[in-house]
């Protein structure tokens, strides 16, 4: 049975280094003679690989995950652990903008205002998933594993101030805030504090 392995790309070089030998790329684009060429991903492909990444992490962490058909509230997925929930807006890029201490992403102001709203029932977060420039290197298949070349970073937007721009606002995603199972636990800790500010009923 094949196992799923999630690996990351280098922060300074988004082009991932992949296993060689018997490894076979599942997703690939070829010229007429069969020679592989780099392929730019469409928006729906980026969206789906982002969801796959979060699904894998939430499953390992034992969290329930809900996909929303429409993100009119600025939310793509909601995680749940018992009575607590975490809302996440997912973004994916093949060419991340690197800044000091992490990454920067221009989020539309409408979504930003929804996620930062202090009256939300669940804290809002932005997650930025980074994939290799060549879609043919996103997924590779070995005899014992399927490797997903994707890694992510996150930022909590709950309760932040007004946007710096009128159309988009730059969101800083710290390098140390990688999107992992442990990070999801941190998000739920914040959700508990938000719903129980005095610590009532929290173990």
Report the location of each language-model feature.
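Mixed-charge (Asp/Glu-Lys/Arg
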Residues: 1-73, 78-203
